[in-house]
Structures are given as structure tokens and as C-alpha cells.
């Protein structure tokens, strides 16, 4: 009955019965044969039933009952391994045995799956089964990796080999699942480890890391991992994190620094470690013997201790007789007050790392071989692919994979450095050694993408308080810095250049500096691993940054902080408080330029200022906490802490941060305490000097600053530390900014402007400012009038000849001295600096400020300049008086203050230090021009480059116009007309400059492709010139054959002459398929129903360079020219070009459009032509053909695939009348290579423009 009760408590009896019957039906050992394992009749179905039980009962109900029953029935060891061994021994077995083996794996994978303890989801069943299943998994691992009958791991891989041989794109979902199943099986075997809270009864060496590595090597599992890792991204994609998981559980907690050392060196290291451990044990025994009980301790001891106050305290125990320190410690322990204990926190150490792993020599060599091969072939592909999976947050990526990724990056980087060091020490420079000497093997974790991923994860882990992930990222960051440092000191010029580039990018972001300082400053109780990682990163980062900043004195850092400050609240009530508060609020962002300039100056890196970030008490406390483990720290860790304290106390002059009782006591105990540092340590002498110098400086400072006696008990803030160090408060210099500048919303007369400002001051109850201004102006007016009267009297008394002899300059130089505006109170002085309305009124009445805006201070002097006459001052006073008695009234109930607005400063992009000299570069490019419409970018290459172009407004000032046309019925005011005309001209000039800039940007890349093209001796240029002049000669010969003859020559028939003239001049009537357009080059395509626009806009834009052969026609037919222009405007404005019927050849006339460069602007205004559309067509890199031989260059953007070109150059589907008139003897121009479009001599006139 008790057994039944026990069964009911652990596993449901019905489930146990089903599982037991299935296991019995699977098979067993026969007695008739050789004693081997014999499968049951329905073994495959039994295995599938067992898989369904595991899957649908355990996993869905979350009970673990089936796994418990299978563990008790010893299914894996007694059945499944034997079945898989039968498949191996029988090589010629059928497909049936392969299915059997695969079904066995489908059961073993969930049985060996890692069991995680989750206090939130664990039930009573979990607490019952978990210890048993953990021990059962250890048994599975021992049986699998030590199975003598057959190699189980290689058998599992053999199942997946056919699936791996299939290309990645051809694999089915079953193939992918098979590969993942095998990899998960290998992961599970590598991951199973003895549970920390349970005692394993078997031999732990059979499940140790050394045994696992030996099994992986013997069964070629390492070769499988290398194959998959090296082909990651090509043949394998979603298996990346599984391979990462396997490698992680193979190398975790293995000391990579000892992996590549020689055997002799390794023995020496182990001897030193043993000696240090024995020495430490002797010191502990010596300390214990001081307090060890004697044979008289059974009698007991009780003593009285007399204190300074005369009170007596009772202390019991024989150890109270040793010394005063022990007695005080016992009295403290007997005190009734106990500080409250915190709740026990979760262990902060990295998850699943466990204790340090010690490998035997055989396993160490096997792992060394695997790591070397992995670094040579699989490191870059695997970690590059995993990083991309982490960045895109792939569905198969878990949170634990982030920690594993950064842990392995750090581990392999350290292993690579140790391998290089071992190869260097061995002096064995073979070909393999040369390959090892290259840092290309780990290049995928030293690129910018990796740094971005690392910085983002570092910031995210710190913000989310994921201390385990943050610890691994800090370890990774440290190893990357050490690797880059080794690259910089490798002696290879290429490696040094790469290292310099990497360091400049790492140190460029100031957010990284801030994050590291915050991490080490905010340490609390995250565990020793976190403490060790953050102090190591801080030490390495600061040390490398200091060395780099000394070599690069112009190091720049970028801060993403904005200097715009938040609006300040009004500090006090009342008129003065409102005035100042309004000034501050108005002045919030008015001085953006100065603030940006200040930020730019602060971005220049200063290592001394950067080092002060590690001086606060929080950072000191972190290193003090780390130093408290001095008995367990090695020499490198002790050196790390020593260097920090030494720099803080003696290089940064912040020794007062160490003047705290617990710190002084720690330093003293490290040297003279009961458990001091080992004197044989290499760091003992340095720590002794540091402790002595620190205590000596503390004593000396106590004599200088008696207040330090109190401050010894507390931590120091920055201001307190500064006072204790220098004896005075830290001086803070404030730079107040003047009030924001205001402007009027509408353009009004000066009288109305003064009235508005007077009304504002009256509404704000600040009439005292008006009285003060009027008094100052009145005194200045009296003084100025007296001076003017005196000057008139002197001029009247002076003879006429002396007056004539005086020069105009001397007379003009006689101006009165300026009058200084003197504020009567401090409030007035503040208002002159902070009140924007008063400042605007002072400017309107003519006052001037001596200091510029950037240098203005509250003590800046305002003056009444000597150029203001007494009458002007009197008029200003009268305007103020008038506005006081009759304030202005506005519509819709608006106030006078509503007529003003803040003067907006032009927005500027964030300026960084590397952009400070941008203006000088633009001045160089723009030839020193400073144009408002240039937007600071300038022309992207010098004008007059490889392409011939017209001169623009940037090259020379526009010509003056002799006549100015005015609108009918317009104003006769010449000033208004001039302003309007100038505005239009400026708008047109700005549009031209904009188009030039766009063109320059589009062809900049082509222009600077090959600098040899600027050389006239370059073969490419010679070839283009030769083709160009050949085409010119051919065209000139054609023109001479027609235009050079005034009449039909003798011997030539009339019909032949008309046919020749019609063929040559056929392009003038607008036919698409004939004329010179068809001969010289192809026309831009017609897309859909849209027609190509007229080329007159191109002429107006290009400046109208005249044609040599068209000059005489222009002189004789000016009227026809005008008609030609007017006729061309209509189709251009309509945006289409209709086809026209062909006219008889003898009735055609050659018409040339002549547009002079001087009338460029007028043509652009008067003609209704879409200039921007033609500019866009120019930007698409095709040149429209014309009679002077310009060639069309079709591009993928400009060519139409549906267009067909007919013989003779005809294209399109327009009316093709008179095809027999085509001139078949005219030479066809060869197309120019599309290396760079050039505009040569001649002018461009399209056939449609000749109508």
C-alpha cells in the first residue's frame, strides 16, 4: 500500500503503466542469439508512441512524468544506444534501420534538453522530478560520450549528412528539421553539467570537459562544427545560433591565456599557482594560530575594559587578551544594535558559466587545434552571420544568445592574441605563422557594424539593468581594445593605420565616454564578475585613450547633446522680476550661434577634463570595493586598482577623495594589518609606497584644513573636495546673455514703430523707462544744440578765405562727441541688458552700443552718436510724448505687444569640430564669393572645367540695361520700379545659380572619375577631339554643297537640285523622320501621349551663343527672326509638338533663331517656356541634336525601348511624306563615347524651331 501511495505522489500510475508497457515492447536482450539487443516487432511504432507521450503529455501539461518514468526504466542507456549501435554495425541495412535511428534521436533530444529553474513557473512536480532528471541527464551524457560499442555522436551526424549535402535552396522543411535536430542533440550533450546543488555518485571525470572534448575530437564532431561554421550564410543560415551555443559550452570558463602556451611554460605556471596557494594557506594558518584556543581555554576568560570615559565594559573569551584591536572588535560584535539585513538577492554572476575548468594535457591540445582551425576558417563567417541575426532580431535568436555572442568574441580575441604571442615566442615563422600574424582572421568583429552593435547593446543592457549581459559586453569591449592596441604596436604599417582608424572611430563618440564613466560610477552590488569587468574596461579604456590622445593632439569627439537650455521660470514677483523673467524667457534660444560655437569649442578632446569623470566618489567607491578583495586578486588586478588610486591622488591632485577612514584603514591593513598582502608579490612594494604617501598627505592636509577631521567620516562631493584641496570655494563664472532681438510683424513707419514700443512699455507698467529715455535725450539735445550754436558762431567770425581754404574732409569731420547713456539704478542697467522692448526702443531712437552682440555684457555702454542732430533728438522726444498721450489702437482688440515678434535666427545644422573650416573650403571653391543664394555649398567644381559653358552671374556682374520697361498703368515712382526690377533680376539669378548647382552635383562624379582627362595629351581627349573635328568637316562639306552655291550650277537638273536642297534642309519643316536630326543623331523619345517640348527654352537658358553661319541671315531677315520666335513659342507653351505636313522643298527657307547673351534675362522672362523641364532633361544626360552637329546620347532614362529607328535615321510614326527626298549620300556622324558630355563650338537649334 505504501508503494502505491508513493507512486501516486510522484507519477500517475496509469501513465507509468503505459510507459512501462511501451518500453517492454521496444525490444530487449535475447538469450538464443549472441546476447545482443533484439528489436521488437513494432519497434518503430513504439518509438513514435514514446515520442508522442513525451511531446503531448510532458511538454503540454508541464509535468515531467514521462521523463521521470523513462529515466527510471533506463531507456536511453539500455535501449536507444543499443539500437543506434545496431545501425552502425550493419552497414548494408535497409532504410528501415535509418528510420529507427532517427526515431531514437527524436526521443533522446527532449530527454537531454536543458532543464531551467524558473521560480515563477515551477510546480510541485518540478520540485519532485528536477533533481532526479538532472542526475539522469548526467547519466545520459556519460553513456553517450563513453559508449564503447559505437560512436553515438558521429552516428547522429551521419543521419543528417544526406540533408547537409543538399543545397540550401533545395532543402525541404524536413531536411532543415533533421539538421537542427542533430545540432540540438550535440548542444544538449555539450551543455549537460553536474548540478551545483547535487552530488553525483559516479565518476565526474567521465562527464568532465576534457572527456567531452576528447569525444568530440575522436568522433569528428569538431570537423562537423568547422564545416558548418565556415559555410555559414551560404549553405546554412538559421543554424548559426545553435553552432554558437555548442561552441560556447565547449570553451566557457576555459582559460584562453593558457591554451597556446608550451607544455614547459604551462608546468611553470601551474607550479607558481601551487606555490602561491600554499603561501596563502600558510598565512591563513598563521593568522588563525594567533587566536587559536589554548589548553586553558576550558576555564573561560572574562575581563573588564576601562574606556576613556571611565566606564567599564565586560568582554568574555580568551582571545580578548591578544590585543586592543581584538577587544574592540568583540565589543562591537556584542552591541545590541544590528543594521537591517537586506533580502538575499539573486546571484549576479554570469549565467551558466560555473567554476573555472581545468583541462588535461590531451584535451588542451585537442581544443587548441580546434580553436586554431576555427579562427582560420570559421570565425569570420559565423560571427558575422550571428551579428546580423542579432541586429535584425531574428525569430530563432534568444536573449541568452546575446551574452554568448559577446562572451565568445572576447574569448576568441584573447585566444588569437595568445596564439600570436606563442608563435612569436617560438620563433617558428612558417607559412602558417605568417597567416596567423594577420588580423584579417578576426576582421568581422573589428568593423564599424560590430562597434555599433556593441555600443547599442552596452547602452541597452545598462538601461535595462541586465547585469549579466552588460558584464559580457564589457569583457568583449576590453578584448577589442587590447586587440586594437596590439595591432597598433605590431610594426606593420597597414595594421597600424587600421588600428588608428578604429581607435578614432571608437573614441569619436562622447556618448561612449559617458557610458563607461556611468557604469563604473553606479556599481552597487552586482557581483564580483561585474566589478572585475567594469574596472578592467575602465582601466583599459582610459589607458589606451590617454596614449592615443598624446599621439593625436587634434583628437575630436562628437557629443550629441544640444546646448539649447530650458526656459527659466521667473525668480521673483514684481516689475523687476517680471522684466527679468520675460527677458530670460524671450532669450531662451535667441543666441543659437554663440551656443553652437561654445559647443564646438568643447568638443575638442581634453584628456584632463575627461579624466575628471572618474574622480567622483562613486568611482572611488567602486575601486575601493574591488581592492577589498586584495587577498584573492592577481598581480594584474592589483596593478589595475593601484594605477587608478595613484593617478587620482598624484596626477589629478584629488587625493582628498581618498581621505576617508575606511579607505585609509584599508590601505593600512593591506600593508600592516593582520592579513596583509603577500610580500613576495610584485605589487607589494608599489602598494606600500602608495599607502605611505597617502597617509602622509592626509596627515599634512589635516594640519592645513582642520575641517578635514569632520570630513574624514563622509564621502566628498566635488565642491567639498575642491575646498579641502585648495582652501577656497570653486569659482563659477556665469556669462549672461542679452535679451532676444525683436522685430515688427509688419512694415510700418518709424513714428508708428515708436508708438508701438511706447504702448508696450505702458501696458507693462514700465513708464519709468520712458521717462529715463526722454531725460537722457533731452539732456543730449540741449548739449548738442549748444554745440551747434557755438559752431555757427565760430563759422560766422571766420573770414571767407579761411572757410574756402578748409577742405571738405575737415568740415565733415567736425561732429560733436557722443553722449554716454548712464543708467540711474541697477534695475535700469539690468533692463538695458534684459528688456527686449526697451532695447528695441533705444535702437529706434538712434542709440548705439559700443560692444558687439557676441561680446555684450550687462555693463555694456550705450551712446547717443554725434551724427544725431539736435533737431532729430527733439523730433524723437516729441514722438515719444505723442505716443504717451495718444497710445496706438489696433483692430480686433490686439495689443501693442502683438505687433512684435522675436527675430528668428537662421537655422543651422549641428556644427561639429571637423566642420569648423568648412567656410574656408567653400571660399576656396567659390573663389571667395559670398552669395546668399549659394546655401553654403558653392559650385561643386571650378567654373570653366572640361565642359564649355556660358558665363553666369557668379562669374561676372550682369551688364547694365540701357532701358527699363514699366508696366502700363503702374506707379511712376522710380524707386518702386527699381526695387521690383532688382527683385526679379535677383530671383532669376538665384534660379540660374540653383540650376548650375544641380547640374554640377549631377556630373561631379563623372568629372572626377579620371584626373587624366584634364590633360590635353591624354589619349581619350585626343580621340574625342579627332572625332569632333572630323564631324565638323563633314558637316561643313555638306553645307558648302548647298549654302555655298547661290544658284543651280550648270549641268545639274532642276529636279536633282531641288531634291538635294530638300534633303539637306528637310529638318526645317518639323518632320520627325528627316533632316539633320535624323542624320546627326537620334531624337529624345516620345513617351505615351506627351510630346517633346520645344528647344527654345534650351536656347534661352544657354545664353544664346550665336552661330557663325547664321549672322548674315539674321541681318537680312530680322523680321523673319521675330516671326520664328513667335511661332516657336506656341508649341513650347502648349507642351507638345504637332506633326506637320511636308511642304515642297523649293518653298522652304532657312531660319535661324538668334538670341544674344546680353538679353538672356529678358528672353527668360518674356517667353512662356518651361525652363525647369528642359533643365531636368539636361540633367538626364542627353544632348539634343541640331544643325551644328550636337550629338544625342541616349541613356536608360532617356531612351524608349518601344521606339524603332528606320533606315536613314527616320524614327517614330509621324507623317513621312517624300521619303525619296532623303539625302542618302550625307555622311552619318559617329556617336561619341559616353564618358562625359561636352558642349563644343556652335549653337543648338532644333528642327522644330525653324518653323
From Swiss-Prot:
It is found in: Nucleus. GO terms for biological process: DNA repair; DNA replication checkpoint signaling; meiotic cell cycle; replication fork arrest. GO terms for molecular function: DNA binding. Residues 576-591, 1069-1079, 1103-1122, 1157-1179 have a biased composition (Acidic residues). InterPro entries: Timeless (IPR044998), Timeless_N (IPR006906). Component of the fork protection complex (FPC) consisting of TOF1 and CSM3. Residues 328-354, 564-601, 901-1021, 1041-1251 are annotated as: Disordered. It comes from Chaetomium globosum (strain ATCC 6205 / CBS 148.51 / DSM 1962 / NBRC 6347 / NRRL 1970) (Soil fungus). Keywords: Cell cycle, DNA damage, DNA repair, DNA replication inhibitor, Meiosis, Nucleus. Belongs to the timeless family. Its main location: nucleus. GO terms for cellular component: replication fork protection complex. It comes from the Eukaryota. Residues 1182-1205 have a biased composition (Polar residues). This is Topoisomerase 1-associated factor 1. Residues 1123-1136 have a biased composition (Low complexity). Residues 344-354, 592-601, 985-1011 have a biased composition (Basic and acidic residues). Forms a fork protection complex (FPC) with CSM3 and which is required for chromosome segregation during meiosis and DNA damage repair. FPC coordinates leading and lagging strand synthesis and moves with the replication fork. FPC stabilizes replication forks in a configuration that is recognized by replication checkpoint sensors. PANTHER family: PROTEIN TIMELESS HOMOLOG, TIMEOUT/TIMELESS-2. The gene is TOF1. Residues 1137-1151 have a biased composition (Basic residues).
Amino acid at each position: 500500500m505504501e508503494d502505491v501511495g508513493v507512486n501516486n505522489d510522484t507519477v500517475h500510475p496509469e501513465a507509468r503503466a503505459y510507459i512501462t508497457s511501451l518500453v517492454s515492447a521496444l525490444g530487449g536482450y535475447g538469450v538464443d542469439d549472441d546476447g545482443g539487443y533484439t528489436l521488437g516487432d513494432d519497434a518503430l511504432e513504439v518509438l513514435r508512441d514514446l515520442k508522442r507521450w513525451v511531446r503531448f503529455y510532458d511538454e503540454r501539461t508541464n509535468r515531467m512524468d514521462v521523463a521521470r518514468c523513462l529515466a527510471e526504466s533506463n531507456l536511453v542507456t539500455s535501449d536507444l544506444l543499443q539500437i543506434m549501435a545496431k545501425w552502425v554495425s550493419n552497414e548494408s541495412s535497409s532504410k528501415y534501420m535509418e528510420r529507427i535511428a532517427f526515431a531514437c534521436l527524436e526521443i533522446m533530444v527532449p530527454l537531454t534538453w536543458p532543464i531551467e529553474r524558473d521560480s515563477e513557473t515551477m510546480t510541485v512536480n518540478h520540485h519532485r522530478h528536477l533533481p532526479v532528471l538532472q542526475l539522469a541527464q548526467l547519466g545520459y551524457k556519460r553513456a553517450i560520450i563513453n559508449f564503447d560499442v559505437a560512436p553515438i555522436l558521429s552516428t547522429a551526424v551521419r543521419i543528417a549528412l544526406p540533408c547537409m549535402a543538399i543545397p540550401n535552396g533545395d532543402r525541404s522543411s524536413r531536411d532543415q528539421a533533421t539538421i537542427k535536430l542533430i545540432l540540438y542533440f550535440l548542444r544538449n550533450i555539450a551543455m549537460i553539467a553536474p548540478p551545483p546543488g547535487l552530488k553525483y555518485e559516479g565518476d565526474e571525470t567521465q562527464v568532465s570537459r576534457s572527456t567531452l572534448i576528447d569525444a568530440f575530437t575522436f568522433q569528428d564532431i569538431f570537423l562537423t562544427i568547422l564545416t558548418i561554421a565556415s559555410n555559414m550564410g551560404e549553405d546554412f543560415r538559421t543554424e548559426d545560433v545553435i553552432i554558437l551555443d555548442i561552441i560556447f559550452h565547449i570553451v566557457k570558463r576555459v582559460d584562453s591565456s593558457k591554451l597556446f602556451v608550451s607544455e614547459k611554460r604551462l608546468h611553470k605556471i601551474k607550479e607558481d599557482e601551487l606555490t602561491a596557494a600554499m603561501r596563502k594557506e600558510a598565512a591563513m594558518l598563521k593568522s588563525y594560530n594567533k587566536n587559536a584556543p589554548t589548553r586553558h581555554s576550558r576555564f573561560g576568560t572574562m575581563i573588564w575594559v576601562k574606556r576613556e570615559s571611565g566606564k567599564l565594559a565586560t568582554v568574555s573569551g580568551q582571545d580578548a587578551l591578544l590585543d586592543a584591536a581584538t577587544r574592540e572588535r568583540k565589543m562591537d560584535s556584542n552591541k545590541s544594535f544590528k543594521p537591517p539585513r537586506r533580502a538575499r538577492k539573486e546571484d549576479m554572476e554570469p549565467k551558466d558559466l560555473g567554476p573555472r575548468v581545468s583541462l588535461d594535457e590531451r584535451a588542451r591540445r585537442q581544443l587548441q587545434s580546434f580553436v586554431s582551425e576555427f579562427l582560420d576558417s570559421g570565425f569570420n563567417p559565423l560571427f558575422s552571420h550571428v551579428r546580423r541575426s542579432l541586429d535584425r532580431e531574428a525569430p530563432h535568436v534568444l536573449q541568452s544568445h546575446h551574452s554568448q555572442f559577446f562572451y565568445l568574441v572576447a574569448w576568441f580575441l584573447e585566444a588569437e592574441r595568445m596564439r600570436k604571442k606563442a608563435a612569436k615566442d617560438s620563433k617558428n615563422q612558417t607559412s602558417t605563422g605568417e597567416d596567423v600574424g594577420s588580423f584579417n582572421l578576426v576582421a568581422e568583429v573589428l568593423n564599424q557594424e560590430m562597434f555599433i552593435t556593441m555600443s547599442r547593446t552596452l547602452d541597452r543592457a545598462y538601461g535595462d539593468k541586465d547585469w549579466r549581459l552588460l558584464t559580457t559586453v564589457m569583457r568583449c569591449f576590453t578584448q577589442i581594445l587590447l586587440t586594437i592596441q596590439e595591432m597598433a604596436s605590431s610594426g606593420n604599417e597597414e595594421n597600424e593605420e587600421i588600428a588608428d582608424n578604429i581607435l578614432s572611430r571608437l573614441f569619436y563618440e562622447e556618448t561612449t565616454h559617458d557610458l563607461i564613466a556611468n557604469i563604473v560610477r553606479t556599481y552597487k552590488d552586482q557581483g564580483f564578475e561585474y566589478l572585475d569587468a567594469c574596472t578592467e574596461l575602465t582601466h583599459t579604456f582610459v589607458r589606451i585613450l590617454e596614449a592615443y590622445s598624446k599621439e593625436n593632439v587634434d583628437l575630436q569627439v562628437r557629443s550629441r547633446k544640444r546646448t539649447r537650455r530650458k526656459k527659466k521660470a521667473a525668480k521673483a514677483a514684481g516689475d523687476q522680476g517680471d522684466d527679468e523673467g520675460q527677458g530670460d524667457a524671450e532669450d531662451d534660444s535667441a543666441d543659437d550661434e554663440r551656443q553652437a560655437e561654445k559647443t564646438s569649442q568643447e568638443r575638442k578632446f581634453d584628456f584632463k577634463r575627461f579624466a575628471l569623470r572618474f574622480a567622483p566618489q562613486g568611482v572611488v567607491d567602486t575601486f575601493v570595493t574591488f581592492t577589498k578583495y586584495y587577498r584573492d586578486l592577481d598581480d594584474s588586478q592589483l596593478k589595475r586598482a593601484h594605477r587608478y588610486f595613484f593617478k587620482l591622488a598624484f596626477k589629478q591632485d584629488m587625493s582628498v577623495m581618498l581621505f576617508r577612514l575606511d579607505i585609509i584603514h584599508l590601505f593600512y591593513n593591506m600593508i600592516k594589518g593582520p592579513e596583509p598582502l603577500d610580500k613576495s608579490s610584485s605589487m607589494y612594494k608599489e602598494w606600500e609606497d602608495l599607502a605611505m604617501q597617502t597617509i602622509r598627505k592626509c596627515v599634512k592636509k589635516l594640519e592645513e584644513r582642520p575641517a578635514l577631521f569632520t570630513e574624514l567620516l563622509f564621502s566628498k562631493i566635488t565642491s567639498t573636495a575642491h575646498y579641502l584641496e585648495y582652501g577656497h570655494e570653486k569659482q563659477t563664472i556665469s556669462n549672461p546673455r542679452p535679451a532676444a532681438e525683436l522685430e515688427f510683424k509688419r512694415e510700418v513707419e518709424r513714428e508708428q514703430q515708436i508708438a508701438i514700443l511706447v504702448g508696450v512699455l505702458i501696458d507693462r507698467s514700465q513708464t519709468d523707462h520712458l521717462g529715463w529715455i526722454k531725460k537722457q535725450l533731452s539732456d543730449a539735445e540741449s548739449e548738442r544744440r549748444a554745440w551747434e550754436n557755438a559752431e555757427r558762431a565760430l563759422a560766422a567770425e571766420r573770414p571767407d578765405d579761411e572757410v574756402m581754404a578748409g577742405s571738405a574732409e575737415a568740415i565733415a569731420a567736425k561732429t560733436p562727441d557722443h553722449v554716454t547713456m548712464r543708467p540711474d539704478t541697477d534695475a535700469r542697467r539690468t533692463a538695458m541688458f534684459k528688456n527686449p522692448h526697451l532695447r528695441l526702443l533705444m535702437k529706434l531712437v538712434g542709440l548705439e552700443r559700443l560692444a558687439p552682440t557676441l561680446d555684450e555684457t550687462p555693463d555694456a555702454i550705450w551712446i547717443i552718436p554725434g551724427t544725431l542732430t539736435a533737431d532729430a533728438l527733439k523730433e524723437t522726444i516729441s514722438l515719444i510724448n505723442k505716443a504717451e498721450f495718444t497710445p496706438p489702437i489696433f483692430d480686433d482688440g490686439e495689443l501693442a505687444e502683438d505687433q512684435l515678434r522675436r527675430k528668428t535666427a537662421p537655422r543651422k545644422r549641428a556644427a561639429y569640430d571637423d566642420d569648423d573650416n568648412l567656410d574656408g573650403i567653400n571660399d576656396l571653391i567659390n573663389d571667395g564669393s559670398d552669395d546668399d543664394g549659394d546655401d553654403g555649398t558653392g559650385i561643386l567644381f571650378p567654373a570653366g572645367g572640361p565642359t564649355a559653358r556660358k558665363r553666369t552671374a557668379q562669374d561676372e556682374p550682369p551688364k547694365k540695361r540701357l532701358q527699363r520697361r514699366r508696366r502700363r498703368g503702374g506707379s511712376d515712382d522710380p524707386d518702386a520700379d527699381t526695387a521690383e526690377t532688382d527683385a526679379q533680376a535677383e530671383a532669376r539669378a538665384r534660379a540660374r545659380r540653383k540650376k548650375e548647382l544641380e547640374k554640377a552635383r549631377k556630373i561631379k562624379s563623372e568629372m572626377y572619375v579620371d584626373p587624366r582627362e584634364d590633360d590635353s595629351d591624354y589619349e581619350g581627349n585626343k580621340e574625342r577631339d579627332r572625332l569632333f573635328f572630323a564631324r565638323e568637316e563633314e558637316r561643313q562639306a555638306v553645307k558648302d554643297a548647298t549654302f555655298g552655291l547661290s544658284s543651280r550650277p550648270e549641268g545639274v537638273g532642276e529636279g536633282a537640285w531641288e531634291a538635294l536642297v530638300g534633303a539637306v534642309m528637310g529638318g526645317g519643316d518639323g518632320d520627325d523622320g528627316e533632316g539633320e536630326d535624323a542624320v546627326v543623331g537620334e531624337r529624345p523619345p516620345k513617351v505615351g501621349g506627351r510630346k517633346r517640348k520645344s528647344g527654345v527654352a534650351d536656347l534661352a537658358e544657354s545664353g544664346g551663343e550665336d552661330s557663325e553661319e547664321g549672322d548674315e541671315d539674321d541681318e537680312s531677315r530680322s523680321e523673319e527672326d521675330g516671326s520664328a520666335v513667335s511661332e516657336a513659342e506656341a508649341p513650347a507653351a502648349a507642351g507638345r509638338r504637332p506633326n506637320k505636313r511636308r511642304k515642297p522643298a523649293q518653298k522652304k527657307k532657312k531660319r535661324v533663331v538668334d538670341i544674344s547673351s546680353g538679353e538672356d534675362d529678358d528672353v527668360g522672362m518674356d517667353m512662356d517656356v518651361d525652363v525647369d523641364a528642359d533643365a531636368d532633361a539636361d540633367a538626364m544626360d542627353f544632348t539634343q541634336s541640331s544643325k551644328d552637329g550636337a550629338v544625342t546620347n541616349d541613356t536608360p532614362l532617356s531612351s524608349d525601348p518601344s521606339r524603332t529607328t528606320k533606315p536613314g535615321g527616320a524614327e517614330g510614326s509621324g507623317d513621312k511624306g517624300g521619303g525619296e527626298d532623303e539625302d542618302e549620300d550625307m555622311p552619318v556622324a559617329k556617336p561619341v563615347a559616353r564618358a562625359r558630355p561636352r558642349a563644343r563650338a556652335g549653337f543648338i537649334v532644333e528642327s522644330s524651331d525653324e518653323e
